[in-house]
Amino acid sequence: MLECNHNYKEGLTIIFKEVAVENFTKIPTAVLKGANRIELNDNLAVGGTTPSHGVLQEATKYLQEKSVPVVEMIRPRGGDFVYNDLEIKMMESDLFEAQKLGVDGVAFGALTADGDIDEEAMEQLIAASAGMQIVFHMAFDALAEDNKKAAIDWLVDHDVDRILTHGGPLTTPIDDTLDNIKKYIDYADGRIVILPGGGVNFENVDAIAEKLGVKELHGTKIIDGVNN
């Protein structure tokens, strides 16, 4: 007997919904309401930081039992994405912990002060992420615009799986950044998943998916009744 999948739309197009949550509290509701993947954070008020070891351990165990993949945010603080050596070491340590716990994926990004990818830091972090999917998070939106195509190429060359992007500053409504996101999707040309987020919610998710021609989207409020 076929299981009911509430991510089916008319025409049998599936929307794959990644829900960003803060700590464990909302995870059971998100799973119950059809989340396809969870991005686990602490402190969403600053865009998400690394959750505690205890939260990660229990959330990962719960989600493994439910067969829902989890992506852990690896970010030692709010603010910019320019990290010093000590912060990179902290992130490496968190990545090794994630590996031990069987986390499915990790989200991180490191930039230089002049708005480019910090290649040395990223190579260290990627090396510490063996066996897990890698997401370059919204640090992408803080790159200098002229550097974004080269950044996509670099991330493809380093086997990064997805780029999470709002297509511009988070203060700009996503309806006004869709053209930028479409440009990144077209340039990526299937080499890496471009994951739209930041302002995607249960009311606009279908329209955004259709406009961009994507099947995978990210948001805190992407499912009705979770975080809203």
Task: Locate predicted features.
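Active-site-adjacent beta->alpha loops and helix N-cap segments on the catalytic face
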Residues: 25, 44-64, 112-130, 143-150, ...
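Catalytic cores of alpha/beta
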Residues: 22-32, 82-95, 141-158, 184, ...
